[in-house]
Each structure stands twice: as structure tokens, then as C-alpha cells.
Amino acid sequence: MNASEFRRRGKEMVDYVANYLEGIESRLVYPDVEPGYLRPLIPSSAPEEPETYEDIIGDIERIIMPGVTHWNSPYFFAYFPTANSYPSMLADMLCGAISCIGFSWAASPACTELETVMLDWLGKMLRLPDAFLAGNAGMGGGVIQGSASEATLVALLAARTKVIRRLQAASPELTQAAIMEKLVAYASDQAHSSVERAGLIGGVRMKLIPSDSNFAMRASALREALERDKAAGLIPFFVVATLGTTNCCSFDSLLEVGPICNQEEMWLHIDAAYAGSAFICPEFRHLLDGVEFADSFNFNPHKWLLVNFDCSAMWVKQRTDLIGAFKLDPVYLKHGHQDSGLITDYRHWQIPLGRRFRSLKMWFVFRMYGIKGLQAHIRKHVQLAHEFESLVRQDPRFEICMEVTLGLVCFRLKGSNQLNETLLKRINSARKIHLVPCHLRDKFVLRFRICSRQVESDHVQQAWQHIRQLASSVLRLERA
């Protein structure tokens, strides 16, 4: 493909993408395929000779689209949203064209410097404390990670290195292995599974703190666990507080947990993967109160801030905590400015070496939507969630299982877990809308999350009528 054909095919692809998104609600939101459907549709090995673009694009509809779960459909109400916007897609195209691997300032100055500025822009939108901003000469700063899972792992590994060095400075006879076997980290029992995985990868105990009646981690439960573990000779060093849990969008109490972490010299990491986007709205910013106690903070613009995956924003108060844990300087990566104090080499802030020019997406989206446009997007989703909540409350057969704070509604039929499992199977088998469940204590609960950029009140109303009809059918069968 030469430049001339690329121009022509590129315009065709833009038309295809625009048509796909404009007509997405006419497609089944959940694919009607079985595991292994794709392999018989394609050859068993790559072609020896080039194939035509026409053949490839024809196979998109024949092979790929039948197996796609359409996350951007206005009838997709599962998981959490994946952000999507035309400015972000255009920026991703440019990112692919530039195709730099921005592991250091020298590898691509613009890639590095735009990321630093965009994380400061976003930090100011969230009204983060100045300590988290790079500014002109700040000690903290932001970095784009691939996911919240990566951010949690990076924070845990940095905290682990920091506590080991602190203890060895006080007691040089202590070995790293002796310290490691006593380290213990904490999170709520509502924390995402990636938090437990970070403990597994980091080789440390991860203890889950029982949450309260609102599914939040509180000071009393954390303090009890700390005292018990210290009495047993363990070394508490790391706490993950979740703002907007995956199950039900509950919020750990930063104002309670934060001071304990500071008093005990434990690293506090905040995981706000989903909810963090909402903090750009003044009416939701109070949910972040207590962030000043944290050592690191993370959320995913790629969930709710119209920036396509992947883009997970992470800030730290002390950049040296990350650099101290990850810095390696082989001669082939060194450059003349690295010790100047004027630049950032992001390879020392993350686990991989390579990194894409992801800040372009943020730059395009922030400029083309503006803060007000992004706030309007958040507020629309929250309003639609409350609309769905109101519909559920009007039907006495159903119950709301958790206060609706942002864009997630947790609900269920009154009755057994089996009844609700049957209802969910009916919903997803019909493929008109897509939902996923959660467990809240011993209850099987349905999650209804407003996800699509294109979702409107009509889609919510249609989804509710569909759920009600299926519920009536399930209840009739139960009584039969």
C-alpha cells in the first residue's frame, strides 16, 4: 500500500467507522456465536502472497463483526464504560503514524513533555493537591499507565522498595528476604481483583478488610487488622483505598483511612479507576476528599472521559519513589539530558520499557470538548442512572441494593438468588441489552451501568421495559 492508496483507503475506513457507530444500535449488542466460531472461517496459516484490501475489509463484516460485543452500543449496560470519541480516534491515528516508542525524553521529547503537561491539566481539573503536579519544579507528577491494574502494581512495588530500604537503613543486618516475608498490604473486601493480583505478583501478603454496611472500608476495621498483624510481628506497609468499587460503586473513607496510613508510615494508594472521571464535576469532588493523605492516585480516563483505551492516569507525590524502585540505566538508553534535572524519563515510572504517544488522545479530547463538555457527558450518564433507579423503584417486584451515586444502579428481583440468575440469563440470551452481575454479601445482584456515549433516555426506557417483561415471564414460571 502506497501513500496514494492509503489516502483512499483511509477515507473509506473513516466512513466505515462513522457508519458503524451511527448504526451501532441496530446490531445485536451481544454476539450470537459459540466458542471457537472464528477459526473455521479463516485459513490455518498466513497467506504466501498479498491479498487485496477489498478482501480484508469484506471479512470484517463476515468474520469479525459477528463475534464483537458492542461496548459502544446504547444497549450495553455491562461492566463499566469504555470511553470512545471521534477526537480520540483521530489522535490514535496520528499516534500510530508517528509510531515513536517514548521510553525517554530523548526517544521523543514531544511524547514525554506533552504527557507531563496533560497529567498536570487533568490533575488541575480534579483539583488535586499541588504536591501531585509536576509544574515547573514539583517533586510529584503524573504518568499514563496501561491500566489501573498496572498502576496498583507499580504503587505496591514502589512502596515495597521504599519500606525495605527504610528498614535496612535503620537495621543494616536485615536482609531483603527477611523483610519481605513479614510485609503485609491491605484493601477492602470490595477491592478489584487486580489488587489481590498485585499482592501475588509483588510476593507480599494482601489482606482484605471487611467493609461496613455501605460496602466501605472504615478506620476501625483497618486499625483492628493493623494492631493484630503488628502484634504477630508483621510489617504493614501498603493500603489500597477504592473510590467507586466495581461491584456497587461504594467509596472507602479516605478521611478515616488516610490519617492512619500517615501515622503508620504506610503507602496509601487510591484506586478510582471508574469514579475518578466524575471528580471533574464540582458536585462530585467531595468524594475525593482526603486525597491529600495519599502517596499515589489513579483513575482511568479511558473509562468515562471520552479518551479511548488505553489511558490510565496515575499521580505520585514523590517521583523519586517510583524512580528509586524501577531505575536501570544501560548505556544504550542513556542520553545527554538525563541528569540535567530538566526532563522526565518515563521508563523509570512503569514496568514496560516501550510506551505509546497516548497523551495525544488527551490533548485532542480536552481541547475539542473542553472541561464543560466533559462535565456534561458525566452529568448526562448520572442523570440517566437516576432515571433508571426511579423506574426500578416504581415496580414493587424489584429492589435497589445500593445508593446510586454515579452511573451504576444495583438492583434485583425480590426473592432468591436463583430467580435473579435466571432473569440475567434471559436478559443476556435475548441479546437486546447486555448486563453483568455482582455479589453483595450473599445476594446475587444485577448491575445496570450507563456506558455508551450515545445512550439516551429512550434506550434506558426500552431496556427497563424489556427487563420487566422478562421478569414477568420468569416469575410466572416460578409460580407454575
Curated annotation (Swiss-Prot):
Signal peptide: none
Biological or metabolic pathway of the protein: Catecholamine biosynthesis; dopamine biosynthesis; dopamine from L-tyrosine: step 2/2
Key words, A-Z: Acetylation, Catecholamine biosynthesis, Decarboxylase, Lyase, Pyridoxal phosphate, Repeat
Modified residues (N6-(pyridoxal phosphate)lysine): 303
EC number(s) stated in the UniProt entry for this protein: 4.1.1.28
Domain of life of the source: Eukaryota
GO biological process terms held by the UniProt record: amino acid metabolic process; carboxylic acid metabolic process; dopamine biosynthetic process; serotonin biosynthetic process
Cofactors (names): pyridoxal 5'-phosphate
Residues annotated as binding pyridoxal 5'-phosphate: 148-149, 246, 300
Keyword Repeat appears in the UniProt entry: yes
Pfam families cross-referenced by the UniProt entry: Pyridoxal_deC (PF00282)
Catalysed reaction equations from the record: L-dopa + H(+) = dopamine + CO2; 5-hydroxy-L-tryptophan + H(+) = serotonin + CO2
GO MF term set: 5-hydroxy-L-tryptophan decarboxylase activity; L-dopa decarboxylase activity; pyridoxal phosphate binding
Gene Ontology CC annotations of this record: cytoplasm
Residues annotated for substrate binding in this entry: 82, 192
UniProt enzyme class: lyase
The protein's assembly and partners: Homodimer.
Similarity remark: Belongs to the group II decarboxylase family.
Identification of the protein by name: Aromatic-L-amino-acid decarboxylase
Protein source organism: Cavia porcellus
